Structure formats: C-alpha cells, structure tokens
C-alpha cells in the first residue's frame, strides 16, 4: 500500500511541476510611430503612445518589444516617406524578428462647431487608418478610422475631447488588430 501511495504522490507532484512549465510563449508586438499628417498636433503622438502601450499591456499573451534590430528594420522600411503597406510591415516583422507589427496613420483630427438652434454642438472630425501584420498567421489588417461623434460644447470646456476620442480609437484598433484572424 505504501508503494502505491508513494507512486500516486510522485505522479501528482510530477504533474503539478510540469503543467506550469509548458506555458506558451507570449507573442512579440512592435509598435511603430504614428504617421501624423495633422499639422501642429504633437499631442496626438503622446496620446497614441500612451494608449497603445497600455492597450498592448492589457492584452494577455502579447508583449511589447523595442530593440536596436527593430529600430534598424523600421528605418530601412522608410514608412514615413513611402507610406504604410503590407510589404513594408512584413519586412519589418521579418527583419525585426517580431510576431505582430502595428502602425497607425492620422490624417485629420479636429473639432468642428455646428450652428444649430439652442446649444452649440461640436462635431469630431477624425480620419486615419490602422495597419497591422501578424507574422504568426499571415493576416494583414487595415481599418479606416472615421469619427463623427457630436457633443455639447459646454461639456468640453475643461478637457480635450478630440484627443480622448482619438485615444479610444487607438485602444479599439489595437484590440481588433491583435484579435484579427
């Protein structure tokens, strides 16, 4: 009986130690700089990085990486001058040795007042694109950003509504891109 009990305990211990050691490795994510085509809006870059880093950290199974090899791959791709396309993202993923590459382009970010009777209303004008390439499954993700939300102007007097909505769009696009199959 002691031998059976000893083998049973050894089996349980072996299972308890081997299961956690077989955990899958996290996929590496490269976050490329924002291609900002909005003149004079430097705050969008800060919002982009802050929201993107937090969104990637919140996704289980993904880890954000930044190294010299990835920086060199980005500089060789010349994304800021040539534009973002599938081939350039594939090249960055291959040369930078990362699993997922995410990039975003912002073309328009403005608050436009609408003249209506009664309260003044602001309309958000948000245009851009989100790009991602997943080297693990070969999926290329492109999504157009459009913002047409409206809000009373009185509510926006103490906070930056346009950049908050842009940050929300960044979080949504990263979540969608990392789930793309």
Model regions: which residues?
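C-terminal/domain-edge helix-coil "capping" segments
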Residues: 23-29, 44, 55, 92-96, ...
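Active-site beta-strand/loop signature of hydrolases that rely on acidic residues for catalysis
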Residues: 31-35
């Amino acid at each position: 009986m002691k031998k059976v009990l000893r083998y049973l305990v050894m089996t349980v211990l072996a299972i308890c130690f081997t299961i956690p050691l077989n955990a899958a490795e996290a996929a590496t994510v490269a976050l490329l700089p924002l291609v900002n085509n909005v003149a004079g809006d430097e705050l969008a870059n800060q919002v982009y990085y802050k929201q993107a880093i937090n969104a990637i950290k919140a996704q289980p199974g993904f880890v954000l990486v930044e190294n010299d090899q990835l920086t060199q791959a980005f500089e060789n791709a010349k994304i800021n001058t040539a534009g973002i396309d599938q081939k350039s993202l594939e090249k960055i993923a291959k040369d930078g040795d990362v699993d997922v590459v995410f990039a975003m382009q912002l073309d328009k970010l403005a608050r436009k007042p609408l003249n209506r009777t009664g309260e003044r209303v602001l309309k958000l004008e948000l245009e851009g694109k989100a790009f991602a390439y997943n080297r693990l499954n070969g999926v290329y993700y492109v999504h157009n950003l459009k913002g047409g939300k409206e809000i009373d102007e009185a509510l926006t007097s103490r906070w930056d509504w346009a950049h908050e909505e842009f940050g929300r769009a960044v979080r949504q696009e990263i979540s969608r891109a990392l789930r793309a199959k």
